[in-house]
Amino acid sequence: MKSFFKDIFLTITFFFFIGSICAQSTAVERPRLVVGIMIDGLQQKHLDLLSGYFDPGGFKKITNQGVNLKNLSYNIVSAGNSSDIATVMTGSVPFYHGVVGDKYFNRINDRVQSIIWDDQEIGIGTTETVSAHNLLSSTVLDELTLAFPNKAKSYVVAIDPEEAVMLGGHTAKSVAWIDDVYMKWVTTGYYREGLNRMADEMNVNGGFKTLSTRVWKPLYAIQTYLAASKNSNLAAFEYHPAEKKSKNSSVTILKNTPAANSLVVDLGLKIIEQEKLGADNVPDMIMLQFTVRTPHEKFFSLQSAEKEDMYLRLDKEIQYLLQQIDTKVGLDKTLVFMFGNQTDVHSPTELGENNIPAGYFSANRSMALVNSYLMALYGQEGWITGYYGKNIFLNKQKIEEKKLNFKEVQQAVCDFMLDFEGVQSASPTWQVLGVGGNSQSEMARLRNSVHKNSAGDVIITLLPGWLEVDEKLNPVGESNAIVSYSPFYFYGWQLKPQVVTTPYQVTDIAPTLSRILNIPMPNACIGKPIVEFTTFP
């Protein structure tokens, strides 16, 4: 009998031992820390031109030792960083996630407002009241939080509020962005931790002020810059981040100087260290926004010493960031991904100077002419109630009062708009929303970029080389290319250097991250995981 029980015990122990080994061998391996690097204005051409000037541990480490998605394109129309970032983080398009641009025309109050504006929230350190309430889909950061409630930690450090909120989604512990009037870190009460204590400490102990008041001069001798080859009399520049953008403005140039990038790195590293990100087997995430924009720039291409210097200094910041992450967490335990927004290689100004057809489309005069045309057809009324982001809004109430055929009025506007310089097409919104068939077509890309909650009644597109500008002459989106490519790199963790030439779209990034982290994909995700550079379970 003893022998019988001994045999049973040994058998159970054996199977338990085997099961334990199998469980260990099939245990999911995940990166302990995910670091997202979003760079406003980043272009692959710039990285290539400056490659010989970069340090080995910054951009070069990511581009040479990482995975280069060489044919990654945006499958939405360029309308600002908010929609670009939301599309990357959700794996979806504005048709589903709702973020159609940095701003939109609010039909309820007949005004253009920020996509993140929310009067139900409070600002912390700022009068801005913002949230992610218009982001209608979960993000990969949200899914990480939901997969590991109260365990996965996620933070965002950004230069601008729109970028901060879209990177943070709905569930980040805290997001922080730069206030370039009062020169401090600020946030919104929408996120549960409010202003994180590291940002608050920098505001109080002078750390923010120290970095934000650094005078910006060339990093190297001015004649060594590429810009000097086009201008032998190129003079050294000097900027003070606290100087005003214009004579009557309270806003400073801080956000378009290297000081902004230094602030992001400094706070990001403080959060990683003090919050112990990446210290256990539960993945954490930190999203960082940088910029290569310069004060008062008119060109998207690399034409100024200031632009070069922004890249060269950011290269050193990224090198320092990676060195510190390697020390504190280990780059073999960290997954880094780096991407930019949609930006044309050349601005309309530059194209025009080289006799290439291009221009800026301003809606103010155009809408006045459209309204005059409709008055000639239907009577002296205000037929246009608003316009923004290639969306024309008609006065539905007045059209109904006059018992007019709404679709006929829509078509009249479409026909008239085709005569405007720079306009490629004009379509009734119902027609755009109903587009199907080839998902790669220009009309499908337009349909992806529209959401029923914020769409106008007529939607236009512009000719190649043309960009829309608002009433302050600020671009509304910065790319009008039929296919808009963006640099995108993965680096670290278990990845080997590789160039992926297979065409992918930015909606494929979130599902790829989800698969690597072994978490559910965002709930509106339409992309597919990129399979070339890693083995998924």
Where are these regions (language model features)?
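Substrate-binding rim/cap in mid-to-C-terminal beta-strand-loop elements of soluble/periplasmic
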Residues: N364-N405, P475-L517, V531-F536
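Short, solvent-exposed turn/loop segments enriched in Gly/Ser/Thr/Pro and often Arg
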Residues: L69-M89, V156-A164, Q289-T291, L335, ...
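His/Asp/Glu-rich, glycine-adjacent segments
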Residues: S92-V93, G101-V282, T291-K298, E421-S425
